[in-house]
Amino acid sequence: MLFVMLLAISAPIAQTGKPWLEWTMKETTKILNDSAWGQTQLETKQADAGPAAITNTGSSRTMVPRDASKDSPGAITSYIKYYIRLLSAKPVRQAVVRKLILDSPDISAQRKEELKSFAEATTSDFIVVAVVAEAKDRSMAGEALQAFKTATLESLKHSTYLERRDGKRLLLADFKAPVADGLGAKFVFPRTLNNQPFLEPGGGQLRFYCVLSKSIRLEARYRISDMMYDGRLEY
């Protein structure tokens, strides 16, 4: 049995109280996977539990897959996580670079400066949603990999969009399949609608939705009021 659960966002950490180059790995990971700009969608496979099976819900801390060797009815036997991030948001790019620096402390000064430029750039033309998949087993990983590999702008443009509270949508403008940069698949949207910024500070939410394949649907919701970062609405 497959079910999809969007993991709840806990309190945002728009400000950590220190420069991004001093973030810990824990702070960096939270920005990427559980923040106003990064969410985690978990899809699990359960041992056959029959028609009376119950879909579980919980937070990222409570939804820990059980031992795959114990395939009693309802036991989670496999899972895949989709990390859905607003890559055009500065805190996400800063977290990506900070994680790389923490993982590679011997990185050259020149490379570090190049990465800092990427992290601190201001995005004005596009909204970019990056999706990274992480699977427990090869079967689920293979299905996701194939879906990303074969997807095209043409196959996605009618079923992939960003939506705000009033129902207005931005349609997909470009799609880049995953490459060796570690950032995942990239879904590119225009930043304006009718020559006006798509989002303004305030309430409401931004919803990302994508039918990647017949069996894979991606969805994430971002609370606009939590997206303020260093005095700017970052998305």
Identify the function of each model-found stretch.
Residues 1-10:
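Bacterial N-terminal signal peptides
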Residues 13-235:
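PEST-like low-complexity, intrinsically disordered acidic/proline/serine-rich tracts
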